[in-house]
Amino acid sequence: ELKYQLLKKYSGYLSSLRQEFSKKKKKGKLPKEARQKLLHWWELHYKWPYPSETEKIALAEATGLDQKQINNWFINQRKRHWKPS
C-alpha cells in the first residue's frame, strides 16, 4: 500500500530523473585503436612528450578524437607515466 502511494505521488518526478540520467554522456576509455596511435607517438617522443599544435591536429585526425581529448590524454599520460630525465 505504502509503495503504491509513493509510486503514485512521485512517478512523474522519477520518470523525469530517469530521462535526465539517460541523457548524461557515458564516460569510458578511448577507443583501443586511438590509444594505440597515441601510445606510439608517446614512445617515439618519450624524452619530451609535448606535441606541437600541428602534431595535435594530426593526431586528432588520425585517431578520430577531438583536440580536447588529445590534450587531456597527454596531460594524464605525463602525470601518470612520465619521469623527466
From Swiss-Prot:
Keyword field contains Disulfide bond: no
Protein name as catalogued: Homeobox protein knotted-1-like 4
Keyword set, alphabetical order: DNA-binding, Homeobox, Nucleus
Database matches in InterPro entries: ELK_dom, HD, Homeobox_CS, Homeodomain-like_sf, KN_HD, TALE_homeobox
Free-text tissue specificity from the UniProt record: Strongly expressed in ear inflorescence primordia and shoot meristem. Weakly expressed in embryos. Absent from leaves.
A GO molecular-function descriptor: DNA binding
GO cellular component, one term: nucleus
ELK domain ranges (all copies): 1-21
Annotation: DNA-binding region: 22-85
Pfam families found in the cross-reference section: ELK, Homeobox_KN
Entries under Gene3D superfamilies matching the protein: Homeodomain-like (1.10.10.60)
Species per Swiss-Prot/TrEMBL record: Zea mays (Maize)
Functional description taken from the UniProt entry: Probably binds to the DNA sequence 5'-TGAC-3'.
Similarity remark: Belongs to the TALE/KNOX homeobox family.
Compartments (UniProt record): Nucleus
